Amino acid sequence: MVANGHFAGVGDVLDAKNYEHGVQVIDEEKEFNPNLSNYLSYENVTPAGFNYHLISVFGSQSTGKSTLLNSLFGTHFSVMSETERRQTTKGIWLSKNKRLKSDKGQDNQTKMADNILVMDVEGTDGRERGEDQDFERKSALFALATSEVLIVNIWEHQVGLYQGANMGLLKTVFEVNLELFLKDKRSNPRSLLFFVIRDFLGTTPLQNLQNTLLQDLNRIWNSLSKPAGLENSSITDYFDFAFAGLPHKNFQPEKFVDEVRKLSTRFCDGHRDPNKTDAKGTGSIEGGIFLPEYHRRIPADGFAVYAEGIWDQIVNNKDLDLPTQQELLAQFRCDEISREVLVAFDEAISPFEAKQAEAVQAGNPQVLGGLGSAMCNARMKSVKNFDTEASRYHKRVYQMKKSELQDKIDSRLKALFLGQLSAAHRSGIQEFTESVTAAVKAGQKRGASYDFAEIVTKERKLAIEKFEKEARAAVVEDTQWSNYQQELSLYQKDLENIGGQLRRDEMRRLATRVGRWVRSRLGESIDLEFNAIGSGRGGSGAPEFGDKPSEKSLWDRVWTLFVDTVLDAERRFTERASSFDASIDEVDVGLWRLRRKSWGVLRAKIDEEMMEGNILLKLRENFEDKFRYDDAGVPRIWRPNDDIESIYTRARESTLTLIPLLSRFRLAETNAPPPLDKWIGHTPSSATPADEEDLTPIGGVDEDEGKSLEEEMTMIGEAKKQDLTVRFKKTADGVYVEAKRSAIGGITQVPLYFYGLLLALGWNEIVAVLRNPAYFLLLFVCAVTAYVTYQLNLWGPIIKMTEAASQQALMEGKTRLREFLEASDTGLQAMAMSKGRNAEEYDMSNMKNRKSAGGFQNNRSHIDDADDDDDF
């Protein structure tokens, strides 16, 4: 026996040299070789897909099957030694065709098919197994389930015999074929039985030998017990037949080699000629013997797994179900391919997933550049690679596994896609808010009017365009989840909400600016009205021109002034709000808030004027205007004969009438509070709690306040009125006493003898004046001037001016003296000793000075507010 050392048997150590000439698929102990896939990879058959062919050889033991395969395909199967007769091939061996062309010099038409795999099956009828035909049947079933062509190796003299012609083996083949067909009615697989008649002498024509074999085969087929529904089936329904004769290898070696070369040309792809049909309409085979219908449609990369599954079913005496095995193989291989594809997919997508997860964890989602193209390419390559490798397997399983793979890929891509849209959504909202705010601030800095609605519309359009651009860039074609219309609608809705919120915020800022404008205007106007109290009778507080207002109509003027100011503010608010594209409801809420806040401003200003110090000052000014000035506004010079008591009483009682007048906000025309509740109006239905939370409750308007409109209009309480009355009377009494003292102080009691003494002692001077015209003229001018001054009531102002001048001179003298003392050491010591001896005196004039200073500061604040709100 000649054995080649470069064969890989079951259990051999993995070595590339062992695969050089073949591999043992199944050993004599019926063990399957797990290294079959390695051999196919070594021979580069795995990537062939369906472009491979499998041939099995049957025949009796020691009939030259291995020799035939070695001669025909250039393989190196072990052959029997000529010196002994014994079993050579044990189990099932497999090798790839090493003979690509039938002979050198032949054209490409004679080239053998690519990737021909040849299985050398253990011979039958051997003495080693004896009557044990279990392996014979199992090997036949395995070969039939995997092979396209079954070569039956027989000698010419065995034709017509039963055992010698392997008819028993063929009967087994037919039986297992029916068994397979019963399980696989959908595909109806066919096989080619290729009879190679050895030691063919040519005495008996090959056609006669062919007829004999076909008759024997038909007889065997007809004798089979066929399953239900297949009773009338014919052998040609499942098998095609081919025949070839080879001369004796030893006696006719050259002719044997030549016939083998010719025979090898038939092992290529063929087809059926529709113009040459048999009785059943089946076209004759033209060209090579490999027809597509013979192929078991098992991809080369899955053949090892498929063959192992088939053998496992066979060796365990289970019903062999080829469709199920094909499905199981498809599931196994598709899962393997899917895992391999996902590895490459992970390499392309995982970096983006990591970046996105990191950004989300940091709370700052980012739009990833190049994500869309990366997802499209990764998905396309993954699906394409899967299709290339897995589409050759069972269609239903392939489609199912492809769908599962796409689901896995799409689930991850969808998460990335939605994360990208979420980041675009968030960044777009932020950029939209910042852009609108920046545009508004720029408009405010320019000092020009700006159209808020136009700004929002422009920025919203840009934001949507940017979002759509980023969304389109992330779209993966042919996926349902790539439709971003829902996210776009949500984004547009959020932009609307943000725009609305920005508009409401801007309207609140507008309302604040208008409120400051109202506060500034009301502050100035109310100051003028309250400063004019007492000017109705003339005096220092009376206006120089126009009508002199009456105290009785004070609240009417205040209410009219307030309403007119707020109406002007409402007009300004409405005009500016129109540029915000604000709704009617929003404008109504803004106006309602403006009226309420304006009333709060007015009430605060009135409360400021009604402070104890301020109101006492107003009452004193009013009293002094009536007491110290006449109806023409001329200051009174009190004389002993003046009726000071009656003037004082009238002035005091007139001023006391102001206290109840000022204590309640009442209109003189109606003698009732102004209609504040109607003027403010009901709360708009569109007002939100946020619109009301910063508003001060108003009595008579807010039911929950618990105060009536009458109480809201009460400016001075009863206790405060009584206190003001008492304190005012004390102040008025002081003024009266001062006036009385002034009148009494003007009375002089000159004794009569004083005039005689004056005449006696001043006679010389009198004579000198009378004799000197210059002196006399000067005396005359002085007398006339004094008379005119008296008639014009100018002595009082002259005296005051003199006193003021003297006071100014005194202050200047003190300043010069202080500077002198500070410049000398003695002066500094004297000043140090005098510290702590000064006391402060407070009277109503000091209060007036403080009020004036406070008014100045208030005016400054009003001026500042007015400067801020010049645009209104």
Swiss-Prot record:
HAMAP family associated with the record: Sey1 (MF_03109)
Stored PROSITE patterns: G_GB1_RHD3 (PS51715)
Chain segments annotated as transmembrane: 750-770, 774-794
Cytoplasmic side: 1-749, 795-872
Keywords associated with the record: Coiled coil, Endoplasmic reticulum, GTP-binding, Hydrolase, Membrane, Nucleotide-binding, Transmembrane, Transmembrane helix
SUPFAM superfamilies attached to this UniProt entry: P-loop containing nucleoside triphosphate hydrolases
Subcellular location: Endoplasmic reticulum membrane
Gene Ontology CC annotation, any one: endoplasmic reticulum membrane
UniProt function note: Cooperates with the reticulon proteins and tubule-shaping DP1 family proteins to generate and maintain the structure of the tubular endoplasmic reticulum network. Has GTPase activity, which is required for its function in ER organization.
Protein name, UniProt field: Protein SEY1
Acidic residues composition bias: residue spans: 690-704
Gene Ontology terms, MF aspect: GTP binding; GTPase activity
Entry EC number(s): 3.6.5.-
GO biological process entries: endoplasmic reticulum membrane fusion
Similarity comment: Belongs to the TRAFAC class dynamin-like GTPase superfamily. GB1/RHD3 GTPase family. RHD3 subfamily.
Lumenal side: 771-773
Any one Pfam family match given in the protein's UniProt record, by short name: Sey1_3HB
Species, as recorded: Paracoccidioides brasiliensis (strain Pb18)
Record-annotated GB1/RHD3-type G domain positions: 49-307
Recorded topology in the membrane: Multi-pass membrane protein
UniProt-annotated stretches for the region Disordered: 676-704, 849-872
Binding residues for GTP: G59, S60, Q61, S62, T63, G64, K65, S66
First-listed, main subcellular location of the protein, grouped into a coarse class: endoplasmic reticulum
Coiled coil: 482-504
